A protein has these predicted regions:
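ATP-dependent adenylation/nucleotidyltransferase module used to activate substrates
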Residues: 1-112
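Conserved S-adenosyl-L-methionine
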Residues: 2, 114-122
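A polyampholytic, Gly/Pro-enriched intrinsically disordered region
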Residues: 22, 112-113, 139-144
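Local cysteine-cluster metal-coordination motifs and their immediate loop/turn environment
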Residues: 40, 119-140
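Structured loop/turn residues at beta-strand edges in well-structured enzyme cores
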Residues: 49, 116, 130
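Short loop/turn hinge sites at secondary-structure boundaries
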Residues: 124, 145-146
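Short Fe-S-cluster ligation motifs
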Residues: 136-138, 142, 148-169
Length: 169
């Protein structure tokens, strides 16, 4: 039962915090073959509606965190598999796969993304925890870009001490 081996599918396993996973090649947050399953479903849907592209949200930090199915190598290999389709050619694209969180934040600001409508936290609650690895990575991206994340966090973030400014569109 794959639901029992990941902190993202089993509420009895604590979600890893940044301090817990440094140097760990495969964290407890890993869900076996998650991206492959979701991309397979997305490709099946794309074929059924005549779409030729599926977009995957993998970022540079995913492969750095040990998620093999968020890596450039995975993207290349899964595209080789989709190319075997004799009926419709569907290409999986991951435009953020080589981008840091800082670059993604900067890109979002450039295109006026409403970050308040995005959610990253692994805890699955309405208010982000600010401590899981996903929140830590997101927070670092905003700090490195010099902006205040408009998403509410369960812990206080002293944005001012980092010299961050509000996003203004």
């Amino acid at each position: 039962d794959i639901a029992n081996i990941s902190s993202l599918t089993n509420p009895d396993i604590d979600v890893a915090k940044t301090r817990d996973v440094l140097g760990d090649p495969q964290t407890v947050n890993y869900v076996p073959f998650r991206n492959m399953m979701m991309l397979s479903i997305a490709c099946a849907y794309a074929e059924s509606v005549g779409a030729s592209d599926v977009f995957h949200g993998a970022a540079q930090v995913d492969s750095q965190a040990g998620y093999w199915d968020g890596s450039v190598e995975f993207l290349e290999q899964i595209n080789k598999v989709t190319a075997l389709n004799r009926r419709d050619q569907i290409r999986i694209q991951a435009p953020l796969i080589d981008k840091s969180k800082q670059e993604i934040v900067e890109m979002g600001i450039k295109y006026k993304l409403n970050f308040a409508k995005t959610h990253t936290c692994y805890e699955g609650k309405e208010v982000a925890c600010g401590e899981c690895t996903a929140c830590s990575s997101r927070l670092k991206g905003f700090v490195d870009a010099g902006y205040i994340d408009p998403v509410p966090y369960a812990k206080d973030i002293d944005w001012e001490s980092y010299g961050c400014k509000s996003i203004e569109y």
